[in-house]
Amino acid sequence: MLPIYICEDDAMILAAQKKFLEKQIMIEGYDMQIALCSRHPQEIIAAVAASPKRGIYFLDVELKDEAMDGFMLGQQIRKFDARGFLIYVT
């Protein structure tokens, strides 16, 4: 099963992305699941470090009130998941 991670600082957008992806996974019967939705990049990094396997990452480009943006988060994810799929959302 392919894990999906979502990092988005806007709670409403995060919920909408999660709902949309869950619906598409169910409709299409994909072998995937939402592993973590978070508004904080450090939570995503910790989860990926704890379970470093190939995943799909939806990363907000501009993370307000955080020390890193989506591109910096992608660089950190690459340290643990070099073959993962990074999708930048703006």
Model-derived segments and spans:
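Amphipathic alpha1 helix at the N-terminus of the CheY-like receiver
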Residues: 12-26
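Conserved acidic carboxylate
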Residues: 8
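Acidic, metal-coordinating helix/loop segments flanking the phosphotransfer/catalytic sites
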Residues: 15-19, 32-56
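Short amphipathic alpha-helix used as the core "switch/output" element in two-component signaling
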Residues: 68-83
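Active-site residues of response regulator receiver
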Residues: 58-62
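Extreme N-terminal starter segment of soluble prokaryotic enzymes
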Residues: 1-4
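A short, hydrophobic beta-strand element within the central beta-sheet of small alpha/beta folds
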Residues: 83-90
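The feature encodes the CheY-like receiver
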Residues: 64-66
